Amino acid sequence: MTIAVGRVRQERGWFDIVDDWLKRDRFVFIGWSGLLLFPCAYLALGGWLTGTTFVTSWYTHGLASSYLEGCNFLTVAVSTPADSMGHSLLLLWGPEAQGDFTRWCQIGGLWTFVALHGALGLIGFMLRQFEIARLVGVRPYNAIAFSAPIAVFVSVFLIYPLGQSSWFFAPSFGVAGIFRFLLFFQGFHNWTLNPFHMMGVAGVLGGALLCAIHGATVENTLFQDGEAASTFRAFEPTQSEETYSMVTANRYWSQIFGIAFSNKRWLHFFMLFVPVTGLWMSSIGVVGLALNLRAYDFISQEVRAAEDPEFETFYTKNILLNEGIRAWMAPQDQPHERFEFPEEVLPRGNAL
């Protein structure tokens, strides 16, 4: 009698076959994340190129916004839907467009198309970094870092307009359109005086400063190879020894600041932490603006400036500037509301 001991070979199902094909070693890795990333990124980019080339914003904003109408790269945009569309997804087959592609473009359907596919594409790219990190056997901090720009995109383009009356108040997808949105944020929300914006600026600029300092310090402390320390030729990717001196770098900054990083892991984590945290904080701030939460208000200065013509601070001047932005932008940006402001309500500085 013969007894065979071992594991029963399981039948390979369709999932295993697809998994093998998706994770096959190729020039451009696909993976499961690619099923989300590649179609969504293709559709978002294609929708943006189509909109900026051919589609007008006349029916939604009363503006020209395409190359076909004479705009250039800095002034083209895929603009937000009309205010009257509310928060409709504006599906091509929905009640607004009723399957008419031309009408769908006219009412702003391309914006929701680009925004939603763009968000899913960014999420797919983050999942791609998770997937490849798992396959290669490294930690997933790249994906964690990429969550910061995703948070900014989702909060600005999706959550903020969801808190307002319609998609109309989101940024349009274009350079000048984004600039207009920044002015809108300042005028209607006093965004620059928001503490979450301050943390975002500190994170982004602080990250840039850390990057510049770190790169310069490494270049300063390269080990000599032969006659000199060569920036581009000396390093071999497979070499076992260090290519720069952490001890020398630590001594250098200790003499300048009196304090320096002595641990490479902590140093690089800090370079990750500063910009990522800053972007996350600014995203939280935008969610607050979606709920119309206010920034810092210094009411005592406003009251005194109103009572005393000779008293003015940079804060009160900025408040007047914000009022001017609102008074100018509301009629220009929302012509359908038919705003009319008499001269006496328009803001004037105390110097006037």
Curated annotation (Swiss-Prot):
Residue numbers binding Fe cation: 214, 268
EC number: 1.10.3.9
One record GO biological process: photosynthetic electron transport in photosystem II
EC top class, as a word: oxidoreductase
Pfam (any one): Photo_RC
Catalytic activity, reaction form: 2 a plastoquinone + 4 hnu + 2 H2O = 2 a plastoquinol + O2
GO cellular component, one term: photosystem II
Signal sequence residues: none
Chain residues that bind chlorophyll a ChlzD2: 117
Cofactor, free-text remark: The D1/D2 heterodimer binds P680, chlorophylls that are the primary electron donor of PSII, and subsequent electron acceptors. It shares a non-heme iron and each subunit binds pheophytin, quinone, additional chlorophylls, carotenoids and lipids. There is also a Cl(-1) ion associated with D1 and D2, which is required for oxygen evolution. The PSII complex binds additional chlorophylls, carotenoids and specific lipids.
Topology in membrane: Multi-pass membrane protein
Keyword Acetylation belongs to the record: no
Parts of the chain that traverse the membrane: 40-60, 124-140, 152-165, 207-227, 278-294
Keywords attached to this entry: Chlorophyll, Chromophore, Electron transport, Iron, Magnesium, Membrane, Metal-binding, Oxidoreductase, Photosynthesis, Photosystem II, Thylakoid, Transmembrane, Transmembrane helix, Transport
Binding site for a plastoquinone: 214, 261
Sites where the protein binds pheophytin a: 129, 142
Binding annotation for chlorophyll a PD2: 197
Source taxon at top rank: Bacteria
Further information: 2 of the reaction center chlorophylls (ChlD1 and ChlD2) are entirely coordinated by water.
Subunit structure: PSII is composed of 1 copy each of membrane proteins PsbA, PsbB, PsbC, PsbD, PsbE, PsbF, PsbH, PsbI, PsbJ, PsbK, PsbL, PsbM, PsbT, PsbX, PsbY, PsbZ, Psb30/Ycf12, peripheral proteins PsbO, CyanoQ (PsbQ), PsbU, PsbV and a large number of cofactors. It forms dimeric complexes.
Family note: Belongs to the reaction center PufL/M/PsbA/D family.
Job description of the protein: Photosystem II (PSII) is a light-driven water:plastoquinone oxidoreductase that uses light energy to abstract electrons from H(2)O, generating O(2) and a proton gradient subsequently used for ATP formation. It consists of a core antenna complex that captures photons, and an electron transfer chain that converts photonic excitation into a charge separation. The D1/D2 (PsbA/PsbD) reaction center heterodimer binds P680, the primary electron donor of PSII as well as several subsequent electron acceptors. D2 is needed for assembly of a stable PSII complex.
Protein's name according to its UniProt entry: Photosystem II D2 protein
Annotated source species: Synechococcus sp. (strain JA-2-3B'a(2-13))
Gene that this polypeptide is encoded by: psbD1
